[in-house]
Amino acid sequence: TAVARRTLVRPIRAVGEVAWDESRVHDVTARVDGWVEDLRVTRAGDPVERNATLLRFYSPDLLATQRELLAAPPGGRLATAARERLRLWGMSSWAIRDMQRRQEPRQRIGIQSPITGVVIDKRVNEGAHVSAGALLYRIADPSRVWVLADVFEQDLPHVTVGQRVVVNVSGATGEPI
């Protein structure tokens, strides 16, 4: 019989839950007061692509600031301040340039997903008024998740944070994850 040196594997049974990696969860918030129009992502669980439009948004403040920018002398302090406010409120540089080229303010702006992922929380409905800072969506990247396991005290010496594990989920196909 051949003898070989190998790492001893000791199975540990524990109950736990799968949770989102908190470093891969992104909040999408309203940056300015306004109304939700054309809600495109309608429920938690929906997959989204990075830069996909989640909803379209109408804001009197955005509209007024666009008009300020169009009326201001190009390159002046007023134009620079208006352009910066529009960027801070979520209007893309491309949309600002396009609005200036057309010399017509955009009635609505799109709010895009910051990542490719899954909507894990949707807090907005079509037609709703939202205030600056209000949470609209929470989106998670499912490419890496956490397993939060409740390990018995006698098994603690055999477990380390960040250790690679094989997880079997009861009720699933029985294949390890």
Language model features with spans:
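Periplasmic scaffold and linker elements that assemble and bridge Gram-negative envelope complexes
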Residues: T1-I177
